[in-house]
């Protein structure tokens, strides 16, 4: 009886917190298996759902636990239901009901879908910067054109947009092999249109794209500034698919409202469904990405080396991948297996500008010059006092330590009285943002830089 009350309370809280579609996907599909010794065992049909439960719903489990059991209940997630008797035939029938696909049309050979098999949800690393985009992508892969249509995902280069597009397509084909799926960069779509137009084969072009169950368009910003006829054809393709309740997923390097050179009617349609952004990965996510990328390379990347690398590249995943490639090249040449910070530093030296300066500037020199400028002692800088002038000096010094040295975030934090790496990240982001808004602060920091160098 208590278990039922406990679970119903969790669902009530979840319904208040999540959107309807997110609630249907994450909460309704979950199942409470048992509560035993203050541990709630919760079945999730997909491992990717765990992060949303951890990030968004864990606290409501605790609240519900105190309400019903007068105890702190800890969740434990499982992904295989105990003694699951559901037959594969029943599962398949359920899937066929959920997906709005075209069973009468001939399926597309995988080689013609444009998808890359290596990109799946299983190997996509989730973090705070992409959790909602991943959640939306998963929802789309469960309910084609019933949840978000179109789904528009935007963010900078190297953040995983292409990976997510492919993951959606691969997931659909895993569940329904006959679904008609096409992944294509916008530039390739444009070229395909122009080729068919030149050859007088527009009917063939229309049949190819307008008979799809799922159209995945990457880098839709490439359509900006193109001729009216090109935008007109994409507009008609979009309408044809949307009217037939076929799923469309688009990615871009900017949000729909910032897409210049596109007809307003297209921009409006891009906003019909759901728009989600992906931001650069945080420190913990970068470490998880590095662990995933390095675990099968045959080298021993020490934990402090991974932390060092995660502290060096914070803009996108491609920089991390490039650094790993450089490191493994050096390791191969030197015939070594253990990757230390020294090896990593040697590898990324060429990837950093002004490294000769970065390597010789000690953090205490930065602290001294910043302290002299703002009238703050190094002891105060390393302390925890929150006076405005001390906080500013501390954050500026952390910012410059990040900009002018190749020290890892944990190392910088340690030099400021054992501060956590997240404090360094916050300080760097704060000062970087203020510099863009405050010319006086920008000039002050430039002046300090000259004294340091």
From Swiss-Prot:
- In this entry, which stretches build a coiled coil? none
Which residue ranges does the record annotate as region Domain IV, binds dsDNA? 332-453
UniProt GO MF annotations: ATP binding; ATP hydrolysis activity; DNA replication origin binding; lipid binding
PROSITE patterns assigned to the protein according to its UniProt record, in alphabetical order? DNAA
* InterPro entries to which the protein is assigned, alphabetical: AAA+_ATPase, Chromosome_initiator_DnaA, Chromosome_initiator_DnaA-like, Chromosome_initiator_DnaA_CS, DnaA_C, DnaA_dom, P-loop_NTPase, Trp_repressor/repl_initiator
- Residues binding ATP, per UniProt: 158, 160-162
Question: Which SMART domains does the entry link to?
Answer: AAA, Bac_DnaA_C
| Cellular component GO terms, alphabetical | cytoplasm; plasma membrane
Has UniProt tagged this entry with the keyword Isomerase? Answer: no
Q: What UniProt keywords are attached to this protein's entry? A: ATP-binding, Cytoplasm, DNA replication, DNA-binding, Lipid-binding, Nucleotide-binding
Q: From its record, what is one biological process in GO terms?
A: DNA replication initiation
Extract the ranges annotated as region (Domain I, interacts with DnaA modulators). Answer: 1-74
Places the protein is found:
Cytoplasm
Ranges for the region named Domain II are 74-113
Cytoplasm in keyword set? yes
Pfam families listed in its UniProt record: Bac_DnaA, Bac_DnaA_C
Q: Which SUPFAM superfamilies match?
A: P-loop containing nucleoside triphosphate hydrolases (SSF52540), TrpR-like (SSF48295)
Q: Where is this region: Domain III, AAA+ region?
A: 114-331
Q: Quaternary arrangement and interactors, per the entry?
A: Oligomerizes as a right-handed, spiral filament on DNA at oriC.
Q: What does this protein do?
A: Plays an essential role in the initiation and regulation of chromosomal replication. ATP-DnaA binds to the origin of replication (oriC) to initiate formation of the DNA replication initiation complex once per cell cycle. Binds the DnaA box (a 9 base pair repeat at the origin) and separates the double-stranded (ds)DNA. Forms a right-handed helical filament on oriC DNA; dsDNA binds to the exterior of the filament while single-stranded (ss)DNA is stabiized in the filament's interior.
The text of the family note is: Belongs to the DnaA family.
- Share the domain note from the entry: Domain I is involved in oligomerization and binding regulators, domain II is flexibile and of varying length in different bacteria, domain III forms the AAA+ region, while domain IV binds dsDNA.
Report the protein name in the record.
Chromosomal replication initiator protein DnaA
Q: What is the lineage of its organism?
A: Bacteria, Bacillati, Bacillota, Bacilli, Lactobacillales
């Amino acid at each position: 009886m208590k278990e039922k009350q406990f679970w119903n309370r969790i669902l009530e809280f979840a319904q208040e917190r999540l959107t309807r579609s997110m609630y249907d996907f994450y909460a309704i599909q979950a199942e409470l298996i048992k509560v035993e010794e203050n541990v709630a065992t919760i079945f999730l049909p997909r491992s990717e759902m765990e992060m949303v439960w951890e990030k968004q719903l864990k606290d409501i489990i605790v609240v519900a636990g105190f309400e019903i059991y007068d105890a702190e209940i800890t969740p434990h997630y499982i992904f295989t239901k105990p003694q699951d008797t559901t037959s594969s035939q029943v599962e398949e029938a359920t899937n066929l009901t959920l997906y709005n696909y075209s069973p009468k049309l001939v399926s597309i050979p995988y080689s013609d879908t444009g998808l890359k098999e290596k990109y799946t949800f299983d190997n996509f690393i989730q973090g705070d910067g992409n959790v909602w985009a991943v959640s939306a992508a998963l929802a789309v892969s469960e309910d084609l054109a019933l949840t978000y249509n179109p789904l528009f995902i935007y963010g900078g280069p190297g953040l995983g947009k292409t990976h997510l597009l492919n993951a959606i397509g691969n997931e659909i084909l895993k569940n329904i092999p006959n679904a008609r799926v096409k992944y294509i960069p916008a530039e390739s779509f444009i070229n395909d249109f122009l080729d068919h137009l030149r050859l007088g084969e527009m009917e063939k072009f229309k049949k190819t794209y307008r008979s799809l169950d799922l159209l995945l368009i990457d880098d839709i910003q490439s359509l900006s500034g193109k001729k009216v006829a090109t935008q007109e054809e994409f507009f008609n393709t979009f309408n044809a698919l949307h009217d037939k309740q076929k799923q469309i997923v688009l990615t871009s390097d900017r949000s729909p409202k910032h897409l210049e050179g596109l007809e307003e009617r297209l921009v409006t349609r891009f906003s019909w469904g759901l728009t989600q952004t992906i931001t650069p990965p945080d420190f913990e996510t970068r470490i998880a990405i590095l662990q995933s990328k390095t675990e099968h390379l045959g080298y021993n990347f020490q934990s402090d080396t991974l932390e060092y690398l995660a502290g060096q590249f914070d803009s996108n995943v491609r920089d991390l991948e490039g650094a790993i490639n450089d490191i493994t090249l050096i390791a191969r040449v030197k015939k070594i297996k253990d990757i230390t910070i020294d090896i990593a530093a040697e590898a990324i030296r060429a990837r950093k500008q002004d490294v000769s300066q970065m390597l010789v500037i000690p953090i205490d020199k930065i602290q001294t010059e910043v302290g002299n400028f703002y009238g703050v002692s190094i002891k105060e800088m390393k302390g925890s006092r929150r006076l405005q002038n001390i906080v500013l000096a501390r954050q500026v010094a952390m910012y410059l330590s990040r900009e002018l040295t190749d020290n890892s975030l944990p190392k910088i934090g340690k030099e400021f009285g054992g501060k956590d790496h997240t404090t360094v990240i916050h300080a760097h982001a704060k000062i970087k943002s203020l510099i863009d808004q405050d010319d006086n602060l920008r000039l002050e920091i430039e002046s300090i830089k000259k004294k340091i160098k």
